[in-house]
């Protein structure tokens, strides 16, 4: 799908690339990840836990950030390039 592994990966990348809050959060996840945590793991954790997770646990199209169909390697590559 448009060069991405599948719809879920494409959709997550699309939302991160086109929403200012998600974009800035993703950039922060690259900088502030902990230990061996990947940027994508940090982003998913930030988006799924606490108050944010209650409201932003999925893209605007309903794809959950922790959807196992999302290709983590592709998402990490995209996040490193932000």
Task: Identify the meaning behind each predicted range.
Residues 1-82:
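Acidic interaction surfaces
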């Amino acid at each position: 799908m448009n060069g991405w592994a599948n719809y879920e990966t494409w959709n997550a990348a699309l939302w991160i690339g086109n929403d200012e809050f998600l974009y800035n959060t993703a950039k922060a996840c690259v900088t502030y990840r902990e230990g061996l945590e990947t940027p994508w793991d940090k982003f998913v954790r930030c988006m799924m836990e606490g108050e944010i997770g209650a409201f932003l646990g999925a893209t605007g199209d309903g794809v959950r950030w922790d959807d196992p169909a999302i290709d983590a390697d592709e998402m990490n590559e995209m996040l490193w390039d932000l």
